[in-house]
Amino acid sequence: MVERSQHLQDVFLKTVRKQEISLTIFLVNGVKLTGIVTSFDNFCILLRRDGHAQLVYKHAISTIMPGQPIKIFEGEGCE
């Protein structure tokens, strides 16, 4: 069970990192990035694609879409 004190973005990013799920990230300027999260902190996400790393600042992100359905919470109801 996920502690309620954790931020949803941290739970989401931790899940896709552990499961190595490919993401599509849209930036506020319209740029589309794809890759796998290798690390993240309060300010940025490290994205890997084709052996190259990209450091993406969270304030530049508009939308993150996983490449497949993910299960974040046990029971998977509306949280």
Swiss-Prot record:
GO annotations of cellular component type: cytosol
Residues making up the signal peptide according to the UniProt record: none
Record's keyword annotation contains RNA-binding: yes
Coiled-coil blocks: none
MF annotations from Gene Ontology: RNA binding
GO biological process, one term: regulation of DNA-templated transcription
InterPro entries according to UniProt: Hfq, LSM_dom_sf, Sm
Residue ranges occupied by any Sm domain in the UniProt entry: 10-70
Keywords of the record: RNA-binding, Stress response
Family: Belongs to the Hfq family.
Assembly and oligomerization: Homohexamer.
Role description: RNA chaperone that binds small regulatory RNA (sRNAs) and mRNAs to facilitate mRNA translational regulation in response to envelope stress, environmental stress and changes in metabolite concentrations. Also binds with high specificity to tRNAs.
Protein name: RNA-binding protein Hfq
Origin species: Bartonella bacilliformis (strain ATCC 35685 / KC583 / Herrer 020/F12,63)
Lineage summary: Bacteria, Pseudomonadati, Pseudomonadota, Alphaproteobacteria, Hyphomicrobiales
